[in-house]
Amino acid sequence: MRNRSALVREIGPWRGVLLIALLLALVATGSTAARERPITVFAAASTTDVLQRLGGRFERDGGAPVRFSFASSSLLARQIEEGAPADLFVSADEQWMDYLQQRSLIQTATRRDLLANVLVLVAPKGRGFPVTMKRGFDLPGAFRGRLAVGDPAHVPAGIYAKEALQHFGWWEALKGRLDSADNVRAALRLVEMGEADAGIVYATDAMASSKVVVLAEFPSRSHAPIVYPAALCRGARPGAAAFLAFIGSAKAAPAWREAGFRLAD
């Protein structure tokens, strides 16, 4: 059996080669780890279905892994303010993007209007009723139960809903019958389960559900424009810029349109 000294003499000439190989392996491992580190996207609940599909496609095309946190824009903005590690924020209104911009929590130069949406009145499937979107129509008298909306105090869909109800003169009669939800998808679920007799959600949410029927579309003049801005957060990882570019690209446009979104001008 060879002694330790003999073994050292044999390895000696190869010591430099082995060291270089080890260093290269460590660099490669570090590079792979950095490349695979996920991008964290905070996005409005109404974008859930499309962004999950686009995230998977982005990864299959060689992009960094993407993980999502979907909730109301207000909740997400406050979480970012409190230090939550988000790389990209997609809001369902300009107010909450402005909120972060005023606090220097997004990279203003990357901010862009990504999408637009439409507000609709829905009911559980099989329980629809006639609705006319004009002043003088008695919407409060057209149904007896609860009206599901995003919380008008902070949820964008609820804020738009309140504006639309005020526009037509229905707010005072209906505000005591509201079921206020934490986000627009939660409001939709209340209608799907029959816990609310009607709801105000985005057209894209209604399209994603087989359990509700659209009764009418609120005209755009009845509320502020429904615009979805997106921006990189302060300190975002480099891969996040590529994902922002991807979701706003022509390659992603068909997925948005298929879900009922309108591309921002």
Model-flagged regions — what are they?
Residues 2-18:
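Bacterial N-terminal signal peptides that target proteins for export
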Residues 8-12, 26, 190:
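Compositionally biased, low-complexity repeat tracts
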Residues 16-28:
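Bacterial N-terminal signal peptides
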Residues 29-84, 91-94, 98-117, 122-265:
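Exported/periplasmic ABC-transporter solute-binding proteins
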